[in-house]
Amino acid sequence: PIYIEIGMGKGNFIIKNAIANPNINYIGIEMYDSVILRAVEKTNELELNNLYLIRMDARLIEEVFDKEIDLIYLNFSDPWPKERHTKRRLTSPRFLARYDSIFKDKKHIIMKTDNIDLFNYSVESLKEYGYNINDISNDLHSYKDNIITTEYEDKFTSKGIKINYFDASKN
């Protein structure tokens, strides 16, 4: 299987997943050089055979993958709060259409965010696009144990900020 994280930041989440699940291939996607460099430095020390990093804009995702992805993680994505920026959200209909061509069989997206407006928008967007919400919480850390966290997630939870989460799929 191949799992990707779009907007992986410094890579903490995807690196921890690759270590914990050696039989799954992980691909981290990040658009900013300075950020992905941090992840590259961390991964070089670990010599993981199941983790790959790509510096690219997510708008080009269809040019890189074709019916081979099993799961997409969207962790603490930019909420693009202004109405005119809605199309830039990684859960906008425009992005969901892009994802259609990269999924192998079943479409599967897991999202975590501290931003309730982005969360609500994303849940509605996925439902309108035909996804089923399999699991959902507005307080992930009181709901599940043994969570692999992101750097942002650690920062927010240490301040008492609740993490919104959903797991959605579409056949």
Tell me what each language-model feature is:
Residues 11-15:
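Glycine-rich SAM-binding Motif I of class I
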Residues 36-38, 119:
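Short alpha-helix immediately C-terminal to the canonical SAM-binding loop
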Residues 40-66:
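S-adenosyl-L-methionine
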Residues 7-9:
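Class I SAM-dependent methyltransferase "Motif I" SAM/SAH-binding loop
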Residues 24-27:
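Short beta-strand element of Class I
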Residues 122-124, 129-171:
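Class I S-adenosyl-L-methionine
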Residues 32:
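Conserved SAM/SAH-binding beta-strand->alpha-helix loop
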Residues 91-108:
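A short glycine-rich, Lys/Arg-flanked "PGG" loop and its adjoining helix->strand segment in the class I
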